[in-house]
Regions:
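A short, flexible low-complexity segment enriched in Lys/Arg and Gly/Pro that occurs
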Residues: 1-7, 61-71, 98-104, 187-200, ...
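Active-site-adjacent bridging/hinge elements
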Residues: 3-9, 167-171
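Active-site nucleophile and cofactor-binding loops and adjacent substrate-binding regions
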Residues: 5, 20-27, 49, 77-79, ...
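Conserved phosphate-binding catalytic cores of ATP/NTP-utilizing and phosphoryl-transfer enzymes
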Residues: 8-45, 67-82, 92, 197-206, ...
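Short, hinge-like loop/turn segments at secondary-structure boundaries
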Residues: 19-20, 63-66, 254-258
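Residue-level detection of beta-strand-connecting loop/turn positions
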Residues: 25, 62-63, 99, 313, ...
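C-terminal, non-catalytic interaction/recognition modules in large multi-subunit enzymes and RNPs
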Residues: 42, 52, 105, 109-113, ...
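Glycine/threonine-rich beta-strand-loop-alpha-helix active-site module
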Residues: 44-47, 54-104, 113-115, 240, ...
Length: 688
């Protein structure tokens, strides 16, 4: 018996440990994706695995991206794992209304009682929305539902539950939802959340998501994949015949795998590079012997070696394949530039030597389809709600589709395991392996009205928060200090043209509650003088600062007609900003100047140029100058990079949806927050 590991390889029972199997199921899906990519010669793919409770996404470009730490239940484990991002959005994600917004998840209906359509008094879930819209067909599901487990999906109960929710929402908001438009609204919200997760493993790491093929699998993904591709601008989608059980397919394709790591932590030099060769041999030899003792042929055993490298003074290393010294060094620099946006400016150190040994197994061969068959005839037809209308679409059984068959959407394809919806702007082709390849006819722009509605309100809430989250990812990756990189003592947020807080990532509350005053102080001090490419620095507690070590970088965002439209800011705790004691938190200070340097409206970047000399003078021209200037400079540059990320992403939103729509929804989100707080206070008064 062989067991799957989070790293994407198999091991025996004696070698298996719990921490190495935490993500073994999703890892199987990733390995399945790699098999699909290689057989179709795709350059880069995004794995989109949507199941019942969550969605897992991954990326593959010929190399498996791995991490050395896995998180589960809030606990971090040091374990080699494939790089997989997860979002709580699946078929069981609960649908709700908070009085102003439609909500999808993160709670799940689970398998019992499950969604309303299971007939067990469950709550409305995403599966119910797909059923109402016709994206799944009850006649093709087994009769295993209801109390006696012999009933079909309960379509009437689902419609009744949606009818009740629709009436509640229309009464509360003055909207005019129909059953279909309400269900579609919930789907739109879920699709945006899943698309945002895909951005985390692509755009946030420097990869253009539009240059990838979307490999969709899991029971629910084929109903959503066209919408996800449209949101992200992805042109090509592939659905494997085993798409709903691709994790099992991947595990069947996985290889026996062993790995070993040795910590080194020394400067990367020609000498340390040569020393790593002997370390690699000492690590690999016992792993190869172990596989040979299991009966693996030595000809089928291969090894890969990697070095974990990092810039001196930083914590998180980047893993690069072992190669010639100069080639490997350039590879590290290229990855660093792609992820962080700049070249490493300090010395590089070798942290770990890694070895992976794999016994290549025979992969499952996808059967070739026979093209010498009659053209398929639609099994039946059904109605699906698409693009605001109900339209009739043909249903084809997957087994009837021959190699080379093509058809323009819309249509539905059903097999024993899943249902695929091909939307009108996609064309279908069946390749020789029976893989369903869909291509988007032209990249469509998703449009929204500037009028407030509960669906768009939640979508833009997630979009704005997603921008702040991407800023946080950039800041954590580029920072040098332990405070920001490891303790995560930072916050990122978006503000309207008046400096009012609009959206933030789930960062430090004390930062987020005060940052708006800092932004407003910058606005007041620079009214009519700010230009594109200007970034400002402030930490003054009398102007919204929390305490002096918390430095805030603020930048304006201008629209196409050079009108100041938004502000973006990041706040980070610096290890030292001067003062009478290291750390800038003296317990017996009598005046704020003894805590450190007060910064008020300092132009840190002018016209896109970092004012390093002026910044150093600011930090040193004091009775109690700042310590460790190099770290201060690098952390401020990281904050600037994060703010710049926010500016770029906001500009992308404006380009995609229009300036009027984006600014309107910034206003609506603030209105919604005020209304929600008012309702909460009224409820508190009534109850207490």
């Amino acid at each position: 018996i062989e067991f799957m590991q989070s790293s994407g390889g198999l091991t025996d029972a004696l070698s298996l440990t719990g921490k190495d199997a935490i993500l073994s199921g999703p890892a199987g899906g990733v390995i399945g994706c790699t098999a699909i990519s290689e057989i179709n010669n795709f350059d880069s793919i995004i794995g989109f695995d949507m199941g019942g409770t969550s969605t897992d996404v991954s990326r593959y470009d010929g190399n498996l991206s791995k991490v050395v730490e896995v998180s589960s239940g809030g606990i971090n484990f040091n374990a080699s794992s494939l790089d997989i991002e997860t979002v709580a959005a699946g078929g069981g994600s609960l649908l709700d209304f908070d009085g102003q917004r439609l909500l999808v998840g993160p709670e799940s209906a689970g398998a019992l009682p499950g969604p309303v359509c299971y007939g067990l008094d469950g709550k409305l879930a995403l599966t119910d929305a797909n059923l109402v819209l016709g994206r799944i067909h009850p006649n093709f599901f087994p009769k295993v539902f209801g109390i006696d487990q012999r009933q079909k999906l309960d379509q009437s109960a689902t419609k009744l539950a949606f009818e009740e929710l629709k009436n509640e929402i229309n009464a509360a908001t003055g909207s005019s939802f129909t059953l279909d438009s309400l269900a579609q609204g919930f789907l739109d919200i879920a699709n945006e959340k899943m698309a945002a997760t895909i951005k985390k493993i692509s755009i946030a790491r420097g990869y253009d998501v539009r240059n990838h093929t979307l490999v969709s699998f899991g029971g629910a993904a084929p109903q959503h994949c066209c919408s996800i591709a449209r949101i992200l601008g992805i042109k090509e989608i592939v659905i494997h015949p085993f798409s709903s059980i691709l994790s099992a397919y991947g595990i069947a394709n996985a290889n026996q795998f062993r790995y070993a790591v040795k910590s080194v932590v020394e400067p990367l030099t020609q000498d340390s590079y040569k020393s790593s060769l002997s370390i690699i041999d000492s690590l690999a030899s016992p792993l190869v012997l172990e596989l040979e003792n299991l009966g693996e042929n030595s000809k089928d055993i291969s090894k890969k070696s990697f070095l974990d490298l990092r810039v001196v003074g930083t914590d998180n290393p980047l893993t690069v394949p072992f190669d010639d010294y100069e080639v490997m060094l350039q590879h590290f620099i290229d990855i660093h530039e792609k992820q962080f946006g700049f070249s490493p400016s300090r010395k590089i150190e070798l942290v770990n030597v890694r070895v992976e040994v794999t016994a290549t197994s025979n992969r499952i061969v996808d059967n070739l389809l026979d093209s010498n068959v009659d053209a398929p005839v639609a099994h039946s037809e059904t109605e699906i709600f698409i693009s605001g209308n109900r339209i009739k679409v043909p249903i084809f059984l997957r087994e009837s589709l021959p190699k080379g068959y093509t058809k323009q959407g819309p249509l539905m394809i059903i097999d024993e395991k899943t249902t695929l919806v091909v939307e009108p702007d996609f064309s279908l082709k069946v390749n020789k392996f029976g893989h369903l390849i869909m291509e988007q006819d032209s990249i469509q722009q998703v449009s929204f009205s500037s009028e407030r509605d509960p669906v768009s309100l939640e979508i833009f809430n997630n979009l704005f928060m997603g921008v702040a989250e991407q800023m946080g990812v950039s800041l954590q990756k580029t920072a040098h200090s332990v405070n920001i990189k490891e303790r995560l003592d930072f916050s990122c947020a978006l503000f309207d043209s008046l400096g009012n807080l609009v959206a933030n990532a789930p960062h430090v509350p004390v930062h987020l509650g005060a940052m708006s005053d800092s932004v407003k102080s910058i606005i007041y001090s620079n009214e009519g003088k700010m230009k594109e490419g200007d970034f400002f620095l402030i930490n003054n507690p009398h102007r919204g600062g929390s305490h002096l070590p918390d430095l805030t970088v603020v930048a304006p965002v201008f629209s196409g007609d050079n009108e100041l439209t938004f502000f973006v800011a990041s706040r980070g705790h610096h290890a030292d900003i001067g003062g009478i004691t290291p750390g800038s938190i003296p317990p017996f200070s009598k005046h704020i100047s003894e805590e450190g340097i007060i910064i008020d409206n300092f132009l840190i970047v002018e016209n896109g140029k970092f004012r390093q000399d002026e910044f150093i003078e600011l930090l040193t021209a004091s009775d109690y100058p700042a310590r460790n200037l190099e770290e201060r400079i690098h952390d401020i540059k990281a904050q600037i990079a994060a703010v710049n990320k926010g500016i770029n992403e906001l500009n992308n939103l404006v380009e995609k949806y229009g300036d009027g729509v984006v600014t309107s929804y910034m206003r609506y989100i603030r209105q919604n927050s005020a209304e929600a707080m008012s309702d909460a206070l009224e409820s508190y008064v009534e109850n207490y």
